[in-house]
């Protein structure tokens, strides 16, 4: 026999109200971890830092702030809802609304798919560069909490991001045998922190832009911690003379 849970559960939230969860139907969410993701984002300042560099494309102030739109998009992706179309369903989700600054029972919903689409298309090359810089600054702040590191291991890697339409920049890659994007990612090999990411066309070689990115990252690390030892780790896709 199954045991039914009848007790209510209380969650810590950023809002000045108690959040109780029950299992008797009613308003249902499939993403119970959103309160913790929201709290982590508030402590790190990730979405706030990104929103500061997203161009405001609206001639008049909309119902949703840039910070709220960015947080909605980031949290949706973090919960596995990467498609923009998911916004039309999740804009009424009680926990996602709470994470983005709306009361679950309020009559106001989050942004729809067209608004999220315009948010992403508002980005320019310059704003993407500034967002990457903001991510790097967040990494430096997190990495330095325990003091100046003696060594930093930079993990360079590329990954395949399949596409299923005519997205701008999508190309066919012979090795992966699919149309895709081919982003370059750099992680801290010791902590797992993402340092930066670079979106590239699908037919780009794995090592493309890695040297320029390495020089920029190493330069900033040495500015912050002059004595730090820097090691680089990458797979065979980066075994080219320039690297």
Language-model regions, residue ranges each:
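Alpha-helix N-cap/loop-to-helix initiation residues
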Residues: 206, 239-240
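A short acidic (Asp/Glu
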Residues: 165, 240-243
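Acidic/histidine-rich, metal-coordinating catalytic segments
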Residues: 157, 227-239
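Dynamic "connector" segments at or just before major functional cores
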Residues: 1-205, 209-226
């Amino acid at each position: 026999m199954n045991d039914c849970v009848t007790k209510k559960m209380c969650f810590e939230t950023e809002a000045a109200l108690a959040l109780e969860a029950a299992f008797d139907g009613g308003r249902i969410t499939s993403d119970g971890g959103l309160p913790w993701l929201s709290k982590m984002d508030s402590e790190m300042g990730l979405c706030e830092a990104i929103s500061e560099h997203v161009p405001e494309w609206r001639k008049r102030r909309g119902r949703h702030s840039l910070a709220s739109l960015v947080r909605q998009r980031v949290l949706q992706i973090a919960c596995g809802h990467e498609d923009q179309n998911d916004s039309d369903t999740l804009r009424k989700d009680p926990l996602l609304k709470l994470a983005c600054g709306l009361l679950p029972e309020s009559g106001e919903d989050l942004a729809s798919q067209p608004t999220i689409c315009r948010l992403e298309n508002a980005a320019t090359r310059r704003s993407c560069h500034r967002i990457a810089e903001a991510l790097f600054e967040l990494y430096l702040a997190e990495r330095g909490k325990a003091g100046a590191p003696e060594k930093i291991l930079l993990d360079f890697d590329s990954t395949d991001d399949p596409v299923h339409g005519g997205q701008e920049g999508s190309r066919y890659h012979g090795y992966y045998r699919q149309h895709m994007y081919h982003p370059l990612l750099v992680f801290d090999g010791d902590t797992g922190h993402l340092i930066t990411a670079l979106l590239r066309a699908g037919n780009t070689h794995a090592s493309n832009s890695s040297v320029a990115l390495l020089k920029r990252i190493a330069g900033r690390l040495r500015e912050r911690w002059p004595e730090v030892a820097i090691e680089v780790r990458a797979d065979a896709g980066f075994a080219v003379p320039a690297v």
